[in-house]
Amino acid sequence: MSSDIEAPTSLTSMRGALPPAVADDVRALHLTTVRHDGVPPLSEQPLLWLSDQEAPVVHVLAWHAVTGGAQELVGYAQVDVGSSTTARAELVVAPGHRRRGTGRSLLAHAAQEAASIPGRRLHVWAHGDLPAARATAAATGLVVVRELWRMAVDVTQHPPGAPQLPPGVAVRAFVPGQDEDAWRRVNARAFAHHPEQGRMTSADLRARESEPWFDPAGFLLAERDGQLLGSVWTKVHPGSEAPDGAPGEEVGEIYVVGVDPDAQGLGMGRALTALGLAHLRDRGLRTVILYTGAENTVAVHTYRRAGFARTAVDVMYGPPPAGSPAHGTPLVRVTDTPSSPGDATMGS
């Protein structure tokens, strides 16, 4: 997120999958920004949705005219409009094209998309919780509504304990083409109140199974009498992309831990986390990360007991709660000229 003071050349928007060349442009913009800022401006799901025809999103693209009549992609926003109550956006602006109104224009368009359903709120992720992001949020009437923590542990210093599974529970690896429906049912129940994870569709799961990092051997299912009770899904980040590790070091991730509500209270979450940590340690990894909501104090306490410490924070901004002095103030007045002082961008 950064200040902008001059408008971009043009904005276009579309639904469905982006044309392959445009999707590649967005990925290139994302990687350029990662190298510049040290923080990924877009999370995994928006990147997967770039090429998903059924994704419930609006793509907003900011273009800058270059020599010969060609156009260069200098900004991108993705607005998740799959909910009737909250639209969620992630934004990125090219480092060399900031302070030109691009971010403000993208944010204004995102606000318009959210407002297509009366009363729907716009929430915007700002990855890294940088000081500039907080300043921009304050200038545009946004407040923090959620924090997502990245936590990390050195498993050579904090080796995982032996998993204490309930009697009769057996663990096996996920079988592609066989276990998707059962896993999705338990995942939806386990994350019924989670705004992103609980909505994972068959297409979302298939997209992850097609990713280079997917390894069914690291996707462990806990069953009793053939009934799925929970799972731990791990991931390995290559050294060129890994957060929190030494340069070039592969880093493991406890990607998803889910327990069916009927199996909660049996210590399944702790046991599954220990299984995931042991799997990643046995692969020769030293650093393991995970992401958890700051509001999930029980999980945070469990992870800290296992040696995890907070290493990064992503922040979601949204309108002030009802009853606060700023309640009712627009996030962005979409009639504002993009070149007005104080223009800003999220995720850049």
UniProtKB/Swiss-Prot annotation:
It comes from the Bacteria. Acetyl-CoA 2 binds at residues 257-259, 264-270, 296-301. Acetyl-CoA 1 binds at L91, V92, V93. The keyword Repeat applies. The keyword Hydrolase does not apply. CDD domains: NAT_SF. 1D-myo-inositol 2-(L-cysteinylamino)-2-deoxy-alpha-D-glucopyranoside binds at E44, E196, K235, E253, Y291. Its EC number is 2.3.1.189. It catalyses: 1D-myo-inositol 2-(L-cysteinylamino)-2-deoxy-alpha-D-glucopyranoside + acetyl-CoA = mycothiol + CoA + H(+). Catalyzes the transfer of acetyl from acetyl-CoA to desacetylmycothiol (Cys-GlcN-Ins) to form mycothiol. Monomer. This is Mycothiol acetyltransferase. It comes from Cellulomonas flavigena (strain ATCC 482 / DSM 20109 / BCRC 11376 / JCM 18109 / NBRC 3775 / NCIMB 8073 / NRS 134). The gene is mshD.
